Each structure stands twice: as C-alpha cells, then as structure tokens.
Regions:
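C-terminal domain-tail junction helix/linker
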Residues: 75-77, 98-186
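RNase H-like DDE/DDD metal-dependent nuclease/strand-transfer catalytic core used by mobile genetic elements
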Residues: 1-4, 11-121, 125
Length: 186
C-alpha cells in the first residue's frame, strides 16, 4: 500500500506528487520541503485537507506545532485547511488524484512500487512540460510559468528556464537516477 501526496498550483496547474509507504507528519513535512525546492516561484498559501499529517486534532491546540506548520512558518507560507466534509473545496487536487490514477494504476500493472514511482514521475514530467490546457489558453504548464516569470519576476526564486527538460535527461530520485527520453514539446 502506498500513499499519494499531491500538490497542484491553482493558477498554473503545475503538479507535484510523490508516493510514500506511510502518511506521517514527517513524510508530509519532507514532501512540503521538496515541493518548495522544486517549484521556481515563491509559495504564499497552501490549502490542505484536515489529515492528521497536516493539522492538529481538536483538543491538541495547546501542544507543540506540527512539523508541516513549522516548515510553513519558516518559509512565510500561510497554511489553510479545507472545511471538514467539504472535499470540493480541494477540487483541483481531487481531480489531479483521479487523473494520476487513470494514467497509472487503473491502466497498467506494476511489478514493484519502484516501477510505479518511476512511471508516476514520467507522467508528471509529460503533464507539466508537454500537456496543453485550454484553461491556460493552449499553453503548457511550463510555458505558462515562463510567461508569468517574464511578467512578474519578483514572484520567483529562480529563473524557471532552469527547469527545461531536454533529450537524454536524468533526474535524481530516492532510488538513484531516472532516465527520461526527451519530453520536449515539438
């Protein structure tokens, strides 16, 4: 059994996801730290569900701050929670979860968790760098981010052009290096 952690930018639709064997507070903290290091822009607000890995339980407000909130505070990120029993307030993530499942586990059989993780990363690279969306006026998510950078560079930590994916690209994973055969949009 694996747990899918997904983050999606509400404006650009840029998606980031990881699979983990556990859904603990430490895993959520590490996921957020990796997300912050992955995206080229400054994150100012996060909306999460009320899972124990993201939020304190009722009656524990006086206890120590949870790791996820510590990272948010250190980075100047406002952490908001969805209303309980209102999953539609987090609809973009719910839709992305469905898209990921339809492109992976509902379509293919995997021999191992590593094979699934590698396919998930390949899917996300294709989704973020090659898929054109009507909501972005026909741009890919990456093209939209680059356009935003030219208009408002003060919202970015680094130039998003450094995220360009080309032929024979290798990316680091927890299990080693993953080879991506060019996902350039021609």
């Amino acid at each position: 059994r694996l747990y899918l952690f997904v983050a999606i930018d509400r404006t650009s639709k840029f998606a980031y996801a990881e699979l983990h064997p556990k859904a603990t507070r430490m895993v959520a903290r590490d996921f957020l730290s990796k997300l912050i290091n992955t995206v080229p822009y400054v994150i100012h607000t996060l909306l999460t569900d009320n899972g124990i890995q993201f939020a304190k339980r009722k009656g524990t407000e006086g206890y120590r701050e949870i790791p996820f909130d510590r990272v948010c505070r250190a980075q100047g990120i406002e952490h908001r929670l969805t209303k309980v029993c209102h999953p539609w307030t987090n609809g973009q993530v719910e839709r992305m979860n469905r898209t990921i499942k339809e492109a992976t586990v509902k379509r293919y059989h995997y021999q191992s968790h590593d094979q699934l993780k590698a396919h998930l990363q390949t899917f996300l690279m294709a989704y973020n760098f090659a898929r054109r969306l009507k909501t972005l006026k026909g741009l890919t998510l990456y093209e939209f981010i680059c356009k935003a950078w030219t208009n408002t560079p003060d919202r970015f930590k680094i130039n998003p052009l450094q995220h360009t994916v080309g032929l024979n690209t290798y990316i680091a994973t927890d299990e080693g290096w993953l080879y991506l055969a060019g996902i350039k949009d021609l």
